[in-house]
Amino acid sequence: MARDKIALIGSGQIGGTLAHMIGLKELGDVVLFDIAEGVPQGKALDIAESSPVDGFDAKFTGANSYEAIEGASVVIVTAGVPRKPGMSRDDLLSINLKVMEQVGAGIKKYAPDAFVICITNPLDAMVWALQKASGMPAKKVVGMAGVLDSARFRYFLADEFNVSVEDVTAFVLGGHGDTMVPLVKYSTVAGIPLPDLVKIGWTSQARLDEIVDRTRNGGAEIVNLLKTGSAFYAPAASAVAMAESYLRDKKRVLPVAAYLNGEYGIKDTYVGVPVVIGAKGVERIVEIELAGKDREAFDKSVGAVQGLIDACKKIAPDLLGR
Protein backbone atom coordinates (compact mmCIF):
# COMPACT_ATOMS: atom_id res chain seq x y z
CA MET A 1 0.00 0.00 0.00
CA ALA A 2 1.43 3.33 -1.08
CA ARG A 3 2.20 5.83 1.64
CA ASP A 4 0.49 9.20 1.70
CA LYS A 5 2.49 12.15 0.44
CA ILE A 6 2.65 15.15 2.76
CA ALA A 7 3.92 18.42 1.30
CA LEU A 8 5.39 21.12 3.50
CA ILE A 9 5.45 24.57 1.90
CA GLY A 10 8.23 26.39 3.71
CA SER A 11 11.31 24.70 5.14
CA GLY A 12 12.14 26.95 8.06
CA GLN A 13 12.01 26.01 11.73
CA ILE A 14 8.38 24.88 11.64
CA GLY A 15 8.79 23.07 8.32
CA GLY A 16 11.81 21.10 9.50
CA THR A 17 10.15 20.24 12.81
CA LEU A 18 6.99 19.16 10.97
CA ALA A 19 8.98 16.86 8.72
CA HIS A 20 10.70 15.15 11.64
CA MET A 21 7.45 14.70 13.60
CA ILE A 22 5.68 13.28 10.54
CA GLY A 23 8.52 10.81 10.12
CA LEU A 24 8.39 9.75 13.76
CA LYS A 25 4.63 9.13 13.46
CA GLU A 26 5.06 7.46 10.04
CA LEU A 27 2.16 9.43 8.60
CA GLY A 28 3.62 9.35 5.10
CA ASP A 29 6.44 10.43 2.82
CA VAL A 30 7.45 14.07 3.03
CA VAL A 31 8.25 16.71 0.43
CA LEU A 32 9.90 19.83 1.84
CA PHE A 33 9.44 22.82 -0.49
CA ASP A 34 11.18 26.17 -0.24
CA ILE A 35 12.27 28.93 -2.60
CA ALA A 36 15.75 28.93 -1.00
CA GLU A 37 17.89 26.50 -2.98
CA GLY A 38 19.57 23.83 -0.89
CA VAL A 39 17.59 24.45 2.29
CA PRO A 40 14.79 21.91 1.76
CA GLN A 41 17.23 19.42 0.26
CA GLY A 42 19.59 19.77 3.22
CA LYS A 43 16.87 19.42 5.83
CA ALA A 44 15.32 16.46 4.00
CA LEU A 45 18.68 14.66 3.95
CA ASP A 46 19.42 15.49 7.59
CA ILE A 47 16.06 14.13 8.76
CA ALA A 48 16.34 11.07 6.52
CA GLU A 49 19.71 10.30 8.10
CA SER A 50 18.03 10.27 11.52
CA SER A 51 15.57 7.58 10.43
CA PRO A 52 17.85 4.58 11.16
CA VAL A 53 18.30 5.87 14.72
CA ASP A 54 14.63 6.69 15.32
CA GLY A 55 13.36 3.68 13.38
CA PHE A 56 11.07 5.08 10.69
CA ASP A 57 10.97 4.40 6.96
CA ALA A 58 9.39 7.56 5.56
CA LYS A 59 11.04 9.08 2.51
CA PHE A 60 12.10 12.74 2.51
CA THR A 61 12.60 14.93 -0.55
CA GLY A 62 13.62 18.56 -0.81
CA ALA A 63 12.43 20.68 -3.73
CA ASN A 64 12.32 24.21 -5.13
CA SER A 65 9.54 23.54 -7.64
CA TYR A 66 5.84 23.14 -6.93
CA GLU A 67 5.80 20.16 -9.29
CA ALA A 68 7.26 18.10 -6.43
CA ILE A 69 4.05 18.41 -4.37
CA GLU A 70 1.94 16.82 -7.11
CA GLY A 71 -0.63 14.41 -5.72
CA ALA A 72 -0.04 15.29 -2.07
CA SER A 73 -2.72 14.09 0.37
CA VAL A 74 -1.92 16.87 2.84
CA VAL A 75 -0.27 20.24 2.32
CA ILE A 76 0.93 22.22 5.34
CA VAL A 77 1.79 25.85 4.63
CA THR A 78 4.35 27.65 6.78
CA ALA A 79 5.82 29.89 4.07
CA GLY A 80 6.07 33.58 4.85
CA VAL A 81 7.91 36.05 7.01
CA PRO A 82 7.98 35.09 10.72
CA ARG A 83 7.28 37.46 13.58
CA LYS A 84 10.11 39.40 15.17
CA PRO A 85 10.16 41.18 18.55
CA GLY A 86 7.79 44.15 18.59
CA MET A 87 5.99 42.91 15.48
CA SER A 88 2.35 41.89 15.66
CA ARG A 89 0.88 39.13 13.52
CA ASP A 90 -1.03 41.84 11.69
CA ASP A 91 2.18 43.62 10.64
CA LEU A 92 2.87 40.61 8.44
CA LEU A 93 -0.35 41.02 6.46
CA SER A 94 0.75 42.63 3.21
CA ILE A 95 3.97 40.63 2.93
CA ASN A 96 2.48 37.22 3.57
CA LEU A 97 -0.66 37.88 1.53
CA LYS A 98 1.48 37.85 -1.62
CA VAL A 99 3.04 34.59 -0.48
CA MET A 100 -0.41 33.01 -0.01
CA GLU A 101 -1.41 33.98 -3.55
CA GLN A 102 1.66 32.21 -4.95
CA VAL A 103 1.24 29.16 -2.72
CA GLY A 104 -2.48 28.93 -3.51
CA ALA A 105 -1.72 28.85 -7.23
CA GLY A 106 0.83 26.07 -6.72
CA ILE A 107 -1.58 23.95 -4.68
CA LYS A 108 -4.41 24.52 -7.16
CA LYS A 109 -2.26 23.24 -10.01
CA TYR A 110 -0.50 20.30 -8.38
CA ALA A 111 -2.47 19.18 -5.29
CA PRO A 112 -6.10 20.23 -5.78
CA ASP A 113 -7.46 17.29 -3.77
CA ALA A 114 -5.26 17.78 -0.71
CA PHE A 115 -6.27 18.71 2.82
CA VAL A 116 -4.55 22.04 3.41
CA ILE A 117 -3.42 23.34 6.79
CA CYS A 118 -2.21 26.94 6.99
CA ILE A 119 0.14 28.09 9.76
CA THR A 120 1.29 31.41 8.25
CA ASN A 121 0.40 34.55 10.23
CA PRO A 122 -1.76 36.53 10.57
CA LEU A 123 -3.42 33.14 10.56
CA ASP A 124 -7.15 33.74 10.09
CA ALA A 125 -6.65 36.23 7.26
CA MET A 126 -3.97 34.12 5.56
CA VAL A 127 -6.04 30.94 5.52
CA TRP A 128 -8.94 32.96 4.07
CA ALA A 129 -6.63 34.27 1.33
CA LEU A 130 -5.17 30.81 0.71
CA GLN A 131 -8.61 29.29 0.22
CA LYS A 132 -9.59 32.07 -2.19
CA ALA A 133 -6.30 31.83 -4.11
CA SER A 134 -6.47 28.04 -4.41
CA GLY A 135 -10.20 27.84 -5.15
CA MET A 136 -10.38 24.67 -3.08
CA PRO A 137 -13.47 23.61 -1.11
CA ALA A 138 -13.53 25.45 2.21
CA LYS A 139 -13.92 22.20 4.14
CA LYS A 140 -10.50 21.12 2.82
CA VAL A 141 -8.65 24.31 3.85
CA VAL A 142 -8.14 25.11 7.53
CA GLY A 143 -5.89 27.15 9.76
CA MET A 144 -3.82 25.88 12.67
CA ALA A 145 -4.61 28.16 15.60
CA GLY A 146 -6.98 26.81 18.22
CA VAL A 147 -5.10 23.54 18.72
CA LEU A 148 -1.96 25.52 19.57
CA ASP A 149 -3.72 28.14 21.69
CA SER A 150 -5.63 25.43 23.55
CA ALA A 151 -2.41 23.47 24.10
CA ARG A 152 -0.81 26.53 25.68
CA PHE A 153 -3.87 27.04 27.87
CA ARG A 154 -3.80 23.37 28.89
CA TYR A 155 -0.10 23.50 29.72
CA PHE A 156 -0.45 26.62 31.86
CA LEU A 157 -3.41 25.07 33.70
CA ALA A 158 -1.62 21.75 34.27
CA ASP A 159 1.39 23.64 35.59
CA GLU A 160 -0.81 25.72 37.90
CA PHE A 161 -2.59 22.69 39.36
CA ASN A 162 0.44 20.35 39.23
CA VAL A 163 -1.49 17.70 37.31
CA SER A 164 -0.92 15.81 34.06
CA VAL A 165 -1.61 17.72 30.86
CA GLU A 166 -3.54 14.62 29.76
CA ASP A 167 -6.20 15.37 32.37
CA VAL A 168 -6.71 18.97 31.27
CA THR A 169 -9.10 19.89 28.47
CA ALA A 170 -9.42 23.42 27.19
CA PHE A 171 -10.93 25.32 24.29
CA VAL A 172 -9.71 28.57 22.83
CA LEU A 173 -11.95 30.13 20.18
CA GLY A 174 -11.85 33.22 17.98
CA GLY A 175 -8.99 34.74 16.05
CA HIS A 176 -5.38 33.64 16.49
CA GLY A 177 -4.21 36.83 18.14
CA ASP A 178 -4.56 39.07 21.15
CA THR A 179 -8.37 38.87 20.98
CA MET A 180 -8.58 35.06 21.17
CA VAL A 181 -11.16 33.70 23.61
CA PRO A 182 -10.00 31.04 26.11
CA LEU A 183 -13.29 29.59 27.38
CA VAL A 184 -12.94 29.00 31.11
CA LYS A 185 -16.35 27.38 31.62
CA TYR A 186 -15.70 24.80 28.87
CA SER A 187 -12.24 23.95 30.23
CA THR A 188 -11.81 21.15 32.77
CA VAL A 189 -9.42 19.14 34.91
CA ALA A 190 -10.47 15.47 34.91
CA GLY A 191 -13.94 16.62 33.88
CA ILE A 192 -14.23 19.23 36.64
CA PRO A 193 -14.96 22.69 35.16
CA LEU A 194 -12.51 25.44 36.10
CA PRO A 195 -15.20 27.55 37.85
CA ASP A 196 -15.80 24.59 40.20
CA LEU A 197 -12.08 24.39 40.95
CA VAL A 198 -12.24 28.02 42.02
CA LYS A 199 -15.13 27.19 44.35
CA ILE A 200 -13.24 24.35 46.05
CA GLY A 201 -10.15 26.49 46.50
CA TRP A 202 -7.74 25.02 43.96
CA THR A 203 -7.19 28.45 42.45
CA SER A 204 -8.69 31.93 42.36
CA GLN A 205 -10.54 33.80 39.65
CA ALA A 206 -7.72 36.35 39.62
CA ARG A 207 -5.17 33.60 38.96
CA LEU A 208 -7.33 32.14 36.19
CA ASP A 209 -7.54 35.59 34.62
CA GLU A 210 -3.72 35.77 34.64
CA ILE A 211 -3.49 32.38 32.92
CA VAL A 212 -6.04 33.46 30.31
CA ASP A 213 -4.00 36.59 29.64
CA ARG A 214 -0.79 34.58 29.36
CA THR A 215 -2.50 32.27 26.87
CA ARG A 216 -3.50 35.24 24.72
CA ASN A 217 0.10 36.42 24.68
CA GLY A 218 1.67 32.97 24.46
CA GLY A 219 3.16 33.49 21.02
CA ALA A 220 4.55 36.94 21.83
CA GLU A 221 6.14 35.58 25.02
CA ILE A 222 8.18 33.10 23.00
CA VAL A 223 9.04 35.69 20.33
CA ASN A 224 10.38 38.02 23.01
CA LEU A 225 12.45 35.24 24.58
CA LEU A 226 13.91 33.91 21.32
CA LYS A 227 14.51 37.41 19.89
CA THR A 228 15.29 35.98 16.43
CA GLY A 229 12.14 34.06 15.57
CA SER A 230 8.90 32.57 16.78
CA ALA A 231 7.58 29.29 18.19
CA PHE A 232 7.98 26.14 16.12
CA TYR A 233 7.80 22.98 18.24
CA ALA A 234 4.24 23.46 19.55
CA PRO A 235 2.87 24.85 16.25
CA ALA A 236 4.32 21.86 14.38
CA ALA A 237 2.88 19.38 16.88
CA SER A 238 -0.52 21.05 16.56
CA ALA A 239 -0.54 20.85 12.77
CA VAL A 240 0.54 17.20 12.86
CA ALA A 241 -2.41 16.39 15.15
CA MET A 242 -4.74 17.93 12.57
CA ALA A 243 -3.09 16.10 9.66
CA GLU A 244 -3.22 12.79 11.53
CA SER A 245 -6.94 13.17 12.24
CA TYR A 246 -7.53 13.67 8.50
CA LEU A 247 -5.22 10.94 7.20
CA ARG A 248 -6.42 8.33 9.70
CA ASP A 249 -10.05 9.47 9.72
CA LYS A 250 -9.89 9.85 13.51
CA LYS A 251 -12.74 12.38 13.59
CA ARG A 252 -11.15 14.31 16.42
CA VAL A 253 -12.90 17.40 17.74
CA LEU A 254 -10.29 20.12 17.40
CA PRO A 255 -10.45 23.92 17.54
CA VAL A 256 -9.23 25.20 14.17
CA ALA A 257 -9.64 28.25 11.98
CA ALA A 258 -12.55 27.03 9.87
CA TYR A 259 -14.65 28.70 7.19
CA LEU A 260 -17.94 29.93 8.60
CA ASN A 261 -20.83 30.70 6.30
CA GLY A 262 -23.77 31.13 8.64
CA GLU A 263 -22.51 29.21 11.67
CA TYR A 264 -22.28 31.38 14.79
CA GLY A 265 -24.06 34.04 12.71
CA ILE A 266 -20.87 34.70 10.73
CA LYS A 267 -20.38 34.61 6.96
CA ASP A 268 -17.37 34.32 4.62
CA THR A 269 -14.88 34.36 7.48
CA TYR A 270 -12.27 31.99 8.85
CA VAL A 271 -12.19 31.97 12.64
CA GLY A 272 -11.33 29.53 15.40
CA VAL A 273 -14.17 27.15 16.34
CA PRO A 274 -14.35 23.46 17.31
CA VAL A 275 -14.75 21.11 14.34
CA VAL A 276 -14.68 17.40 13.57
CA ILE A 277 -11.77 16.52 11.26
CA GLY A 278 -12.04 13.25 9.34
CA ALA A 279 -11.28 11.84 5.91
CA LYS A 280 -13.57 14.41 4.24
CA GLY A 281 -11.84 17.35 5.89
CA VAL A 282 -13.99 19.49 8.15
CA GLU A 283 -16.92 17.12 8.56
CA ARG A 284 -18.85 19.12 11.12
CA ILE A 285 -18.67 22.52 12.77
CA VAL A 286 -19.57 22.37 16.45
CA GLU A 287 -21.70 25.36 17.42
CA ILE A 288 -21.40 25.72 21.17
CA GLU A 289 -23.61 28.14 23.03
CA LEU A 290 -21.90 31.43 23.77
CA ALA A 291 -23.54 34.02 25.98
CA GLY A 292 -22.68 37.10 28.00
CA LYS A 293 -19.01 38.02 28.19
CA ASP A 294 -17.96 34.97 26.17
CA ARG A 295 -20.16 36.01 23.25
CA GLU A 296 -19.00 39.61 23.51
CA ALA A 297 -15.36 38.52 23.48
CA PHE A 298 -15.97 36.15 20.56
CA ASP A 299 -17.73 38.86 18.53
CA LYS A 300 -14.86 41.26 19.26
CA SER A 301 -12.36 38.66 18.09
CA VAL A 302 -14.36 37.97 14.93
CA GLY A 303 -14.48 41.71 14.27
CA ALA A 304 -10.69 41.89 14.47
CA VAL A 305 -10.38 39.01 12.00
CA GLN A 306 -12.88 40.58 9.61
CA GLY A 307 -10.89 43.80 9.74
CA LEU A 308 -7.83 41.91 8.51
CA ILE A 309 -9.83 40.15 5.81
CA ASP A 310 -11.19 43.51 4.66
CA ALA A 311 -7.59 44.73 4.43
CA CYS A 312 -6.75 41.68 2.30
CA LYS A 313 -9.65 42.50 -0.02
CA LYS A 314 -8.31 46.03 -0.51
CA ILE A 315 -4.75 44.86 -1.13
CA ALA A 316 -5.74 42.00 -3.47
CA PRO A 317 -9.29 42.63 -4.76
CA ASP A 318 -8.87 39.95 -7.42
CA LEU A 319 -9.09 37.29 -4.69
CA LEU A 320 -12.83 37.95 -4.45
CA GLY A 321 -13.37 36.78 -8.00
CA ARG A 322 -11.79 33.39 -7.45
Swiss-Prot record:
The annotated active site, in chain numbering, is: 176 (proton acceptor)
Q: Any idea of its EC number?
A: 1.1.1.37
Q: InterPro entries from the xrefs?
A: L-lactate/malate_DH (IPR001557), Lactate/malate_DH_C (IPR022383), Lactate/malate_DH_N (IPR001236), Lactate_DH/Glyco_Ohase_4_C (IPR015955), Malate_DH_type3 (IPR011275), NAD(P)-bd_dom_sf (IPR036291)
- For the ligand (NAD(+)), the binding residues are 10-15, 34, 96, 119-121
Q: Which UniProt keywords apply?
A: NAD, Oxidoreductase, Tricarboxylic acid cycle
Coiled-coil residue windows: none
Per the UniProt entry, what is one GO biological process?
lactate metabolic process
Q: Which residues bind substrate?
A: 83, 89, 121, 152
Q: Which GO terms describe its molecular function?
A: L-lactate dehydrogenase activity; L-malate dehydrogenase (NAD+) activity
Q: Which reaction does it catalyse?
A: (S)-malate + NAD(+) = oxaloacetate + NADH + H(+)
Q: What is the annotated role of this protein in its UniProt record?
A: Catalyzes the reversible oxidation of malate to oxaloacetate.
Family membership, please give it. Answer: Belongs to the LDH/MDH superfamily. MDH type 3 family.
Question: By what name is this protein known?
Answer: Malate dehydrogenase
Q: Which organism is it from?
A: Rhodopseudomonas palustris (strain BisB5)
For this protein's source organism, the top of the classification is:
Bacteria, Pseudomonadati, Pseudomonadota, Alphaproteobacteria, Hyphomicrobiales
